[in-house]
């Protein structure tokens, strides 16, 4: 489990994260959402140990990530938004780096590359940005780590590749892995995540499972604008609306509408989820 308690971090005199408290459980995929500059990437780099918490604490199964202990580093993989090409074939690169992660399986890398319709013998410095991203995603999934942190993994992927990404994550990750994915491409995650975290500047606006969200909020696709809507957006033929779920009705989560509803009604949404 990843436990984050009262986490704070600043760049110079500019605070980015303040009093962030989260518990991320094994076996779940978390979508990390927020506007530009709210600290999503900073949070990922803190969790993987690239940065040190200035206040508060982070614990990954009892280990401080910044301690950089081998038993932690061998169980975490961080995929940044921008990845570097190397003058090597994908398969040679994977074979050379894989041993740093004890659960790495070259067969999984090759299988994931095949699922992405990628040639593993292709030189990485000759790949497009999307091809390079798919190679790194394949490697991340092949490492078999307890923690997988991804920053905008679908950036640069075409539409078929985004579907392949969702399938690959579900196919190749361990059942007990904690997966944290930061993205602005919310529709890319809609069918695969278990929980959603929405960060505001220096605050957590929402941290809830999909089941809890749809039990407390109703996503209405209709032609009549509702008076109790927390957020409404006109679509061809009607509206997508987010309303308090006072009747226990089932509805299909719309992450983009949820994000806007939370940002437009921060205190009200907090009250709904805190049963106030």
What are these regions (language model features)?
Residues 148-152:
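Catalytic Walker B motif of ABC-type/P-loop ATPase nucleotide-binding domains
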């Amino acid at each position: 489990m990843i436990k984050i308690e009262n986490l704070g971090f600043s760049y110079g005199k500019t605070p980015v994260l303040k009093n962030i408290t989260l518990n991320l459980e094994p076996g779940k995929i978390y979508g990390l959402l927020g506007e530009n500059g709210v600290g999503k990437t900073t949070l990922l780099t803190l969790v993987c140990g690239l940065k040190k918490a200035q206040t508060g604490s982070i614990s990954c199964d009892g280990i401080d990530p910044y301690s950089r202990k081998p038993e932690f580093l061998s169980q975490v993989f961080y995929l940044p938004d921008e990845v570097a090409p190397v003058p090597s074939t994908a398969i040679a690169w994977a074979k050379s780096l894989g041993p740093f992660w004890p659960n790495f399986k070259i067969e999984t890398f090759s299988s994931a590359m095949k699922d992405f319709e990628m040639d593993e013998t292709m030189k990485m410095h000759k790949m497009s940005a999307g091809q390079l991203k798919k190679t790194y995603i394949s490697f991340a999934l092949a490492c078999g780590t307890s923690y997988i942190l991804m920053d905008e993994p679908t950036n640069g992927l075409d539409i078929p590749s985004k579907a392949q990404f969702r399938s690959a994550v579900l196919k190749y990750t361990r059942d007990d892995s904690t997966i944290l994915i930061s993205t602005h491409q919310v529709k890319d995650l809609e069918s695969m995540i278990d929980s959603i975290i929405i960060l505001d500047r220096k605050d957590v606006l929402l941290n809830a499972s999909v089941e809890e969200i749809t039990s407390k909020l109703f996503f209405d696709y209709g032609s009549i604008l509702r008076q109790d809507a927390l957020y409404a957006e006109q679509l061809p033929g009607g509206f997508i609306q987010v309303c308090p779920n006072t009747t226990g009705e089932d509805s299909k989560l719309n992450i983009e509408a949820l994000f806007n509803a939370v940002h437009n009604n921060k205190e009200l949404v907090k009250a709904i989820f805190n049963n106030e």
